[in-house]
Amino acid sequence: RKTAREIIFDVESHLACSKKKYYSDFYIGITNDVDRRLFGEHNVDKNHAWWIYRTAVDKATAQVVEEHFLSKGMKGETGGGTDDTIYVYCYEVTNTTKE
């Protein structure tokens, strides 16, 4: 489990590997079930798409990371989730993903 600072660093490092250059090209969210949310509901291609997720210390930490990237212009919304919502995920928005 990681701190907000560690997760922000990991996501920023992974963003540098993307060919996209704007935060608005990405979606940030939090969940308690990465497979369901990222690969199911958002329809992200697990094998060929750009995505990352990290496990936060707790829900409050996950929310701090989410709000950080939303303030930079990523797509997504705050709110929702349960106490076990500790996963922060980010993916590149494409014509096949569902926001």
Identify the residue ranges that each predicted region occupies.
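GIY-YIG nuclease catalytic motif and its immediate N-terminal context
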Residues: 1-99
